[in-house]
Structure formats: C-alpha cells, structure tokens
Amino acid sequence: MTIHIGAAPGDIAETVLMPGDPLRAKWAAETFLDDPVCVNEVRGMLGFTGTWCGHRVTIHGSGMGMPSLSIYANELITEYGAQTLIRIGSTGAMQNHVALRDVILAMTCSSISTPSSGIFCELNFAPCADWGLLKAAEAAAGAKGTKTHVGGIYSSDVFYDERPDLTEQMIRHGVLGVEMEAAELYTLAARHGRRALAVLTVSDHLLTHDALPSAERQSSFGDMVEIALEAAFA
C-alpha cells in the first residue's frame, strides 16, 4: 500500500495499462480481462487486475495531466514493480491526414515542461517509446486493419491553451496529436529502466474541429486497448 494506491503487495501485475479516466479503466478491465478484481479505489482512482490470454494485467487510471500520472506511475514502478506501462487514451489530431478514430502510436513526445523537467537543468531530454513495444503495436494494428500513424506527439501541460503560435509550430513540424501525459510516462520509464508506450485514439481534430460524440468514444476505443494488450505480450 502506498499513499495513493491501496493495493496489497502482489496485487499489481508487471504489465499495466493506464487510461486517464478511472471509469475507462473499469470499462476496459470488465471488457477485456478475465476475472478482473478491483485492487485500488483510493481517491476514486480505480485499478483492476485480471488476466488476458493467460497473462496477468493491471488496468489503472492515471488521472488527467502529467503531475497526476507521475504520482501513479512512480508508485506503480517503485513500490509495485511494474515493468511495462502503456498509456491508453485520447488525443487531438494536428495533421490533415490523421482522422477521427485513427490510432496514433507515440514514438516521441515534445513538451514545454514535465514534472521531471527540473532535474535536467539546461538539457532538453527527448522522451521516446520502447522500440519493442512500438514495433509490436504497429504490427498488431496492421493485423487488425486499424488505420495507424507512428510519429511524434505533443504532451501539453494545459488543456485550455491560449498560444495559437505554439499550435502552429507543432503542426508545421509534423506533430501528429496532442495529449497531456505521455512525455512524463516516457521520462519515468527511461529513468527506471522500464518499457513504455502511448497508444492513442483520435477523438478530436484541432484543424477541422470535428469530435467523436460522447456515446461513440467508448466503443471506438476498443481497438486501442486490444493493440496495447497484444503489444505488451508480443
């Protein structure tokens, strides 16, 4: 048990999927895992452990934003021995060739700042995904016929951004999408020698202003969860 996670020793699997929304964690566990058991509900941040194709898996919420994810990922790694951490979540597309419902596999993550920025001083650390997970996820997506894009994303530390100039530069430099967690996850994985990947479903588009209706968001996210699970155990 830690300050923020009430799971007992052994309750957390070495492979952890991390959606931002705790209710999405519950949905994913009940939909894709066999015999899921709730192992955490401290502060309403739900976590479940079960099995997928005979492999133990934990699906645990991270909350919104890098500071929240940093708390849970740190504790999952240092106190519970998590070895593989895969963020599953939504993203806003930033390129015309990326459409709603597409999946983005984040190879690298740009950011202005993360909770870890202070330890690097003048160094601009470049967080990246684990190559083995990335390669396996692309193969799994291809086998499913899911339209997938591999490349850089932007992890923002604000949701209501008031800097259109920054968005313009991200688009100009080919950034595929924006979200709020992956850069810190990749940084923590690098620090602790763990594997990390972000598998993201496009729910909104910054250029067209299209968005998935809320009723469809859950059903459209199934491919993302399956890709993450298949990549974790490839």
Curated annotation (Swiss-Prot):
Annotated site, Important for catalytic activity, chain positions: R217
Binding residues annotated for a purine D-ribonucleoside, in chain numbering: H4, E162, E179, M180, E181, S203, D204
UniProt: phosphate binding residues: G20, R24, R43, R87, I88, G89, S90
EC number(s) recorded for this UniProt protein: 2.4.2.1
Gene Ontology CC: cytosol
Alphabetic keyword roster: Glycosyltransferase, Transferase
Superkingdom to which the source organism belongs: Bacteria
Quaternary organization: Homohexamer; trimer of homodimers.
NCBIfam families noted in UniProt: deoD (TIGR00107), PRK05819.1 (NF004489)
Function (record text): Catalyzes the reversible phosphorolytic breakdown of the N-glycosidic bond in the beta-(deoxy)ribonucleoside molecules, with the formation of the corresponding free purine bases and pentose-1-phosphate.
Protein name per the record: Purine nucleoside phosphorylase DeoD-type
Native organism: Dinoroseobacter shibae (strain DSM 16493 / NCIMB 14021 / DFL 12)
